[in-house]
């Protein structure tokens, strides 16, 4: 190796030393995430997005963003095992307006329900709401001991399982087919569908822990801003002003002429 100065080191110093460190958060903005009006707590939190630069618009980066929120945070409630998915459909100012996108039970709740000495019955069905949303609902239920039962196990016969599954199909289909998405979500919040199934199946075999464990959004109708604004309780969004903004005729005295202005 030749003895001498290393030109690279003396000329430019260390490689990459001149690079200016830019804080990535300086190019981003915070947006508020708003839940639909069927939930008690509307303000979910905030989300980050890169500011509008040239053809890259900030609102386009927010649309389609999915947030998973516990029902306890949405309803200010103790029941925390149900999670709702909300998708951003439109951006108004600094607010992201969301809509229902799915529901799920937490992993620990599902694991706590599965036990020995009982039969687990599951069913799923694809149903369309009156306003054109195609949902896939998954239901789960477990058999329980009868009041006067001494035997340790409470296994249902195959025929009873089929009858219970049929009831699950019927009730889930009926509850969703006859309602729009808003009413379906209002039924999912207290899980009234699961309670109806439990009540209807008592004559076949007593059940407990009956839940709609998951809801998937399969298809959506064409996006309409008016419907989204209705979900958020902000009117129909027809584009007309809120007050009566029509002009009124002004009465003036005969021979009235406007004063001549010196400068315009």
Swiss-Prot record:
| Name listed for the protein in its UniProt record | Small ribosomal subunit protein eS1A
What function is annotated for this protein?
Component of the small ribosomal subunit. The ribosome is a large ribonucleoprotein complex responsible for the synthesis of proteins in the cell. Part of the small subunit (SSU) processome, first precursor of the small eukaryotic ribosomal subunit. During the assembly of the SSU processome in the nucleolus, many ribosome biogenesis factors, an RNA chaperone and ribosomal proteins associate with the nascent pre-rRNA and work in concert to generate RNA folding, modifications, rearrangements and cleavage as well as targeted degradation of pre-ribosomal RNA by the RNA exosome.
Q: Where in the cell is it found?
A: Cytoplasm; Nucleus; Nucleus, Nucleolus
Q: Does the keyword Ribosomal protein apply?
A: yes
State if Ribosomal protein is listed as a keyword: yes
Task: Show the PROSITE patterns listed in the entry.
Answer: RIBOSOMAL_S3AE
Principal cellular location given in the protein's record: cytoplasm
HAMAP family registered for this protein in UniProt:
Ribosomal_eS1_euk (MF_03122)
Q: Where is the composition biased (Basic and acidic residues)?
A: 242-255
- Region spans: Disordered: 233-264
Which terms does the UniProt entry file under GO BP? ribosomal small subunit biogenesis; translation
Concerning its family, UniProt says: Belongs to the eukaryotic ribosomal protein eS1 family.
Alphabetical keyword list = Cytoplasm, Nucleus, Ribonucleoprotein, Ribosomal protein
Give a GO cellular-component term: nucleolus
Name the source's superkingdom: Eukaryota
Quaternary structure, from the entry: Component of the small ribosomal subunit. Mature ribosomes consist of a small (40S) and a large (60S) subunit. The 40S subunit contains about 33 different proteins and 1 molecule of RNA (18S). The 60S subunit contains about 49 different proteins and 3 molecules of RNA (28S, 5.8S and 5S). Part of the small subunit (SSU) processome, composed of more than 70 proteins and the RNA chaperone small nucleolar RNA (snoRNA) U3.
Tell me the GO molecular function terms: structural constituent of ribosome
